[in-house]
């Protein structure tokens, strides 16, 4: 499943699926989705990709943890509805305004974890902490990913457009 196109609302997202690990017993596998985001507060819907991974896994009972290793992103489950996404964008801007002062961005004060090419993104780190979700885990029962009727799996970009990764792990409980 390489260079897939996944429809994300009005956007189309290209991603590459990379197999990282498969156990000898075929009871678990770890995959990484590599993709580029396009904007701040972008919601990337990976539900169909995860459903396809589960279907191809042939796991009857297990779980699927999803994880982002980025501190300025989130993985959430919610409804794919334009009004909700617009409401989220408005409220997160009210709670953590882009134009506020963030000590994280003050190079005269900050002395830790600094890089020359670092983004001015204190607000993105605060937003990620408020959302507080770098991962979710869903059950697989009778070879079916258990997810609510209106629920979708979203990767949320809280910083600027950039290359990102989402790890998907399939675990067999049998």
Regions found by a protein language model. Give the residues of each.
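Active-site histidine-anchored catalytic micro-motif
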Residues: 2-174
């Amino acid at each position: 499943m390489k260079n897939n196109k996944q429809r994300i609302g009005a956007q189309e997202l290209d991603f590459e699926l990379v197999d990282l690990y498969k156990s000898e017993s075929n009871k678990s596998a770890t995959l990484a989705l590599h993709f580029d985001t396009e904007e701040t507060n972008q919601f990337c819907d990976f539900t169909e990709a995860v459903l396809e991974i589960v279907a191809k896994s042939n796991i009857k009972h297990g779980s699927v943890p999803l994880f982002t290793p980025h501190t300025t992103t989130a993985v959430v489950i919610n409804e794919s509805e334009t009004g909700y996404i617009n409401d989220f964008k408005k409220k997160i801007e009210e709670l953590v305004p882009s134009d506020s002062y963030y000590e994280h961005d003050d190079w005269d004060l900050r002395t830790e974890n600094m890089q020359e090419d670092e983004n001015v993104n204190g607000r993105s780190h605060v937003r990620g902490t408020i959302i507080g979700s770098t991962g979710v885990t869903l059950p697989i029962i009778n070879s079916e990913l258990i997810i609510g009727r209106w629920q979708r799996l979203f990767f949320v970009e809280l910083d600027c457009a950039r290359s990102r990764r989402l790890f998907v792990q399939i675990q067999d409980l049998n």
